[in-house]
């Protein structure tokens, strides 16, 4: 076992993004000093974590020196961008090495929003290939390891972002989520991870055109207030007027809520350990005065996993078939990993079933509306078992890895399909000392409610930090 973190007495200290932004504004620390400290931290821990996809340290130094975005709230606070969105002048490799790198010509829209809040990007972070797996363990690029214990996975697909935030390199990093890719790394690395409502933040054109819009951009942080502040600031730059505003969420929820607790997915009951930890949190919510009801039925029909895997495979098939057009002539599908190719083969053999699967996935929104007509919030584990060790979810056999992944991450994709917000909070620890995430979901547009409830839980049960790992009981 090896715990890896970069928390030292430098310009970053152990400040979260809000506190660091205030220190920069007040002149207590300098922008250049903060960026240099983050670079030093990245260089110290990345050899053990393998979290960086591309280092843009000189670009960050230049941005700090020029004072870019000085009027923005997070001005000078360092961050990273996940390597599946474009940053001008930097390659976008999507967690693979299946083509020769080339520089993007312009920032993506979400990159402009992230940087528009004043955050200074130090580079790009690793992910699983095209974000299809819940672990980043590419056969040639190597695994992204968990800073709490490098024998364990950092989760995925926002693996590098999760590892670097948890290790203290930066307080906040870009992430996105098409089946759990914000929430799973949050659960594995002891972080706050909010997947927002469908359409809350801008998306790349290819994601906007999907028949079921499952992808959402967001961030990973160590504190609830950092996540809340990011959405407040992002909303000032880009607003979807079809959704109620998140607004400025700064305090715990006042009203007592109707909360449903579910520990059984469409495939299985959560492991005994994770189930017990979930029920313990349900007890805390009752102590806080919320009305908690234990619900036996899972939040999706029995057909959900098969339908979602078929749709996931449709996305893999699109990457395989359009790779040369999308990524250039050097694209070589034989270099793709076994999960990507296996998913593509699966859907290629079952294309006749895809239209009905898409229809059923779309209809799941009706079920969600009915559910949240009865309850304000749904509590489930983020994943069905505690974080696995590196290698468990990356065997070469496609069917084995698919079965293990489906069983582990079965709770998270439902919110992607229905488009509702969900937040993973690091409210528990496993017997081996690894963070365990608990997931709270609400109806579309109710991110503010989830953040308020998260504030209440953060106050009632402060979570472990990697350099102060004992959870307050």
UniProtKB/Swiss-Prot annotation:
Its EC number is 3.5.1.4. Keywords: Hydrolase. InterPro entries: Amidase, Amidase_CS, Amidase_dom, AS_sf. The keyword Ion transport does not apply. The active site is at residues 82, 157, 181. GO terms for cellular component: peptidoglycan-based cell wall; plasma membrane. SUPFAM superfamilies: Amidase signature (AS) enzymes. It catalyses: a monocarboxylic acid amide + H2O = a monocarboxylate + NH4(+). GO terms for molecular function: amidase activity. The keyword Cell wall biogenesis/degradation does not apply. It is an enzyme of class 3 (hydrolase). It holds the Pfam family Amidase. NCBIfam families: PRK07869.1 (NF005899). Belongs to the amidase family. This is Putative amidase AmiC. It comes from Mycobacterium tuberculosis (strain ATCC 25618 / H37Rv).
